[in-house]
């Protein structure tokens, strides 16, 4: 029965994505992080912000787990059908496959129309780097990198934790991931208060990132991209990133499409030097964005089937 709930959550994400007007736990988690960060910065200063960052992590993840568990508990007390609906809905909100694909498609269409200024604004909504001076190729690369990375932490990882611990654990993971995306930067403003969140996100994504690489390789073979290069580049360039995890899915995509990703970018006005991922020399355009979206859908579907099969064998 639980497997049916997980399947329903996955299907809902495939069909609906994340409608902007719907209530969403991740929005609430984001608001909680903003509120806690403001309070903790008023209390702690200097090196004590490292301790504050630990508190921020514990409070955010702990409150997310407690509230989501209580909502499920309360709904079960009221009616079983309500419990099922809440369970499925909470699980669905942790998945970002369709939403990610839609945002990438918007950028792809804008680039195809030749509206570079609008494309810069759109890509700025899904990446952390400065986008006001990006070329069309750089926008395409940024979009591809984001889709590749979020195949891991926006789909594979939530599915992984959903199958292990249900919506509560999946939402706790999303809290970790949201913390990293909001405060896990290495600049002066966030280095201290975001240190714990960044490290815990690395730990939480350690297994999912490598699973994402594996699923993307399989997807590459199925879609008749360069599956062998996807495997090889994912392994060869796995350390070519400031994150211990991101290069796995990015390398798989770069190899599959025969392109080069990564390199030096600007974040909050500061230049961050990064090694490249992949060894392809062909220009990157909106065509490769479309191919990356295909990889996202295929790898996500493979992941769900694999996790569901293992769940059936074990339970």
Curated annotation (Swiss-Prot):
<keyword id="KW-0169">Cobalamin biosynthesis</keyword>
<keyword id="KW-0812">Transmembrane</keyword>
<dbReference type="Pfam" id="PF03186">
    <property type="entry name" value="CobD_Cbib"/>
</dbReference>
<feature type="transmembrane region" description="Helical">
    <location>
        <begin position="203"/>
        <end position="223"/>
    </location>
</feature>
<protein>
    <recommendedName>
        <fullName>Cobalamin biosynthesis protein CobD</fullName>
    </recommendedName>
</protein>
<dbReference type="InterPro" id="IPR004485">
    <property type="entry name" value="Cobalamin_biosynth_CobD/CbiB"/>
</dbReference>
<feature type="transmembrane region" description="Helical">
    <location>
        <begin position="295"/>
        <end position="315"/>
    </location>
</feature>
<feature type="transmembrane region" description="Helical">
    <location>
        <begin position="78"/>
        <end position="98"/>
    </location>
</feature>
<dbReference type="GO" id="GO:0015420">
    <property type="term" value="F:ABC-type vitamin B12 transporter activity"/>
</dbReference>
<comment type="pathway">
    <text>Cofactor biosynthesis; adenosylcobalamin biosynthesis.</text>
</comment>
<comment type="similarity">
    <text>Belongs to the CobD/CbiB family.</text>
</comment>
<keyword id="KW-0472">Membrane</keyword>
<dbReference type="GO" id="GO:0009236">
    <property type="term" value="P:cobalamin biosynthetic process"/>
</dbReference>
<dbReference type="GO" id="GO:0005886">
    <property type="term" value="C:plasma membrane"/>
</dbReference>
<comment type="function">
    <text>Converts cobyric acid to cobinamide by the addition of aminopropanol on the F carboxylic group.</text>
</comment>
<feature type="transmembrane region" description="Helical">
    <location>
        <begin position="152"/>
        <end position="172"/>
    </location>
</feature>
<keyword id="KW-1003">Cell membrane</keyword>
<keyword id="KW-1133">Transmembrane helix</keyword>
<dbReference type="GO" id="GO:0048472">
    <property type="term" value="F:threonine-phosphate decarboxylase activity"/>
</dbReference>
<feature type="transmembrane region" description="Helical">
    <location>
        <begin position="54"/>
        <end position="74"/>
    </location>
</feature>
């Amino acid at each position: 029965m639980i497997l049916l709930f997980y399947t329903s959550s996955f299907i809902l994400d495939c069909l609906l994505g994340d409608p902007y007007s719907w209530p969403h736990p991740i929005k609430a988690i984001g608001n909680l992080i903003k509120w806690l960060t403001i309070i903790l910065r008023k209390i702690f200063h200097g090196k004590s912000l490292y301790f504050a960052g630990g508190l921020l992590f514990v409070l955010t993840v702990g409150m997310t787990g407690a509230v989501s568990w209580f909502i499920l508990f309360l709904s079960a007390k009221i009616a079983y059908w309500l419990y099922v609906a809440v369970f499925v809905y909470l699980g669905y909100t942790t998945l970002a496959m369709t939403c990610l694909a839609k945002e990438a498609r918007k950028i792809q269409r804008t680039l195809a129309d030749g509206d570079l200024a609008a494309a810069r604004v759109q890509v700025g909504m899904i990446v952390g780097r400065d986008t006001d001076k990006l070329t069309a190729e750089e926008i395409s690369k940024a979009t591809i990198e984001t889709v590749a990375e979020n195949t891991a932490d926006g789909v594979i990882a939530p599915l992984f934790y959903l199958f292990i611990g249900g919506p509560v654990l999946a939402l706790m993971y999303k809290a970790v991931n949201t913390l990293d995306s909001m405060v896990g930067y290495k600049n002066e403003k966030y280095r201290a208060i975001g240190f714990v969140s960044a490290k815990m996100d690395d730990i939480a994504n350690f297994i999912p990132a490598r699973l994402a690489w594996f699923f993307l390789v399989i997807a590459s073979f199925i879609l008749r991209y360069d599956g062998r290069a996807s495997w090889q580049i994912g392994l060869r360039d796995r350390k070519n990133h400031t994150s211990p995890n991101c290069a796995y899915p990015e390398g798989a995509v770069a190899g599959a499409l025969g392109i080069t990703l990564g390199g030096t970018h600007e974040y909050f006005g500061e230049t961050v030097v990064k090694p490249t991922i992949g060894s392809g020399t062909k220009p990157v355009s909106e065509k490769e964005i479309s191919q990356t979206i295909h990889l996202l859908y295929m790898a996500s579907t493979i992941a769900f089937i694999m996790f569901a099969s293992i769940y059936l064998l074990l339970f």
